[in-house]
């Protein structure tokens, strides 16, 4: 049981965030309205084009930081509790937005592997809409909050009905929601003897197995692997960006 499981009212939730009551939360949500508390601006993407960042203003950012902190505490508490169960192994799968993890630790998992497969999740942050965020906090057993409190969490975290890139609460919420996807993916990866990790929307798989029957045609087993991956990804509410799917061998990466 976590601190969230014990919440009864909005005031309980406010106190969990370190506030005296829900008065400040109600003021932002229903008087000012959170959609009026963002500054939006474009930043260039590494491979061309632009990404729009929605940065919360200080009043909302203050609240989102508090939400992020208590979600992290609950997340770590859940992992610690499960790690005590000998039948449960907590794999290190997500390397983005995780304390002690980075793009470097993500790449280290695939060092010296013969083949590396990269799969990109299309419009990653847009996949986390208001209903999905709200539903997660109602249904997930680590939280299991009332519909009223789940609605408040989603209102604090979402901008124009989605999790915004630029809000301090977005990273932890995306990692919480994608945990189930990661666990499903790692089962498929193990079945085909792949190592799997994820950095936000970038999934990486690697293996030392021989994947190509010849240089022009991909093996049937790899096709089956990709088909199973796609089925799980789509059923989990995400979409693959086919333009960014890439298979490379160690000779190509030199």
Could you tell me what each predicted segment is?
Residues 1-46:
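Non-catalytic, polymerase-adjacent accessory regions of viral genome-replication enzymes
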Residues 6, 56, 60-68, 130:
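Generic structural signal for well-ordered secondary structure
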Residues 11, 41, 61, 65-69, ...:
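N-terminal, well-ordered alpha-helical segments
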Residues 13-25, 70, 81-91, 122, ...:
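N-terminal low-complexity, intrinsically disordered segments
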Residues 36-39, 100-103, 188-192:
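Short amphipathic beta-strand starts and helix->beta connectors
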Residues 39-64, 83, 94-96, 155-174:
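Short, conserved non-catalytic motifs in the polymerase core
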Residues 63-116:
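Active-site-proximal segment of RNA-dependent polymerases
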Residues 106-200, 204-250, 254:
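Conserved polymerase palm-domain catalytic core
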């Amino acid at each position: 049981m976590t601190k969230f499981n014990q919440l009864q009212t909005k005031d309980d939730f406010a106190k969990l965030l370190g506030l005296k009551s829900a008065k400040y939360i109600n003021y932002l949500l229903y008087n000012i309205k959170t959609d009026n508390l963002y500054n939006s601006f474009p930043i260039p993407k590494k491979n061309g084009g632009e990404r729009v960042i929605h940065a919360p203003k200080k009043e909302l950012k203050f609240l989102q930081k508090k939400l992020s902190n208590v979600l992290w505490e609950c997340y770590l508490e859940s992992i610690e509790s499960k790690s005590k169960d000998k039948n449960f192994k907590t794999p290190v799968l997500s390397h983005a937005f995780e304390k002690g993890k980075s793009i470097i630790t993500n790449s280290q998992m695939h060092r010296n592997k013969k083949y590396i497969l990269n799969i990109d999740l299309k419009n990653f942050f847009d996949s986390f809409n208001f209903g999905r965020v709200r539903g997660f906090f109602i249904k997930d057993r680590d939280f299991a909050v009332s519909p009223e409190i789940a609605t408040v969490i989603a209102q604090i975290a979402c901008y124009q009905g989605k999790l915004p890139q630029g809000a301090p609460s977005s990273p932890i919420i995306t990692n919480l929601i994608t945990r189930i996807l990661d666990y499903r993916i790692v089962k498929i990866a193990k079945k085909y003897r792949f190592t799997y990790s994820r950095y936000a929307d970038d999934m990486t798989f690697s293996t030392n197995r021989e994947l190509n029957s010849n240089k022009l045609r991909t093996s049937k087993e790899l096709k089956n692997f990709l088909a199973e991956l796609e089925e799980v990804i789509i059923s989990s509410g995400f979409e693959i960006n086919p333009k960014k799917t890439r298979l490379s061998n160690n000779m190509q990466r030199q």
